[in-house]
């Protein structure tokens, strides 16, 4: 399952916290670190790629 979540620089923090607090799937692959820094520099909506494996 591949989820694309459009989020702002503020939403990224909320999303990252939720992902860390909610380990529902066996494998959770989240790409935030690189996008976080970019989002902080520019207030452009960033797409978070969340790969969940059943």
Swiss-Prot record:
Keywords: Cell inner membrane, Cell membrane, Membrane, Stress response, Transmembrane, Transmembrane helix
GO cellular component labels: membrane; plasma membrane
One record GO biological process: cellular response to heat
Membrane-spanning parts: 28-50
Stretches of the chain forming a coiled coil according to its record: none
UniProt membrane topology term: Single-pass membrane protein
Cellular compartments annotated: Cell inner membrane
Gene induction: By heat shock (shift from 30 to 45 degrees Celsius) (at protein level).
Major subcellular location class: membrane
Top-level taxon: Bacteria
Miscellaneous note of the record: Entirely encoded within the coding gene for gnd (AC P00350), on the same strand within another reading frame. This protein is produced independently of gnd.
Name of the featured protein: Protein GndA
Lineage of source species: Bacteria, Pseudomonadati, Pseudomonadota, Gammaproteobacteria, Enterobacterales
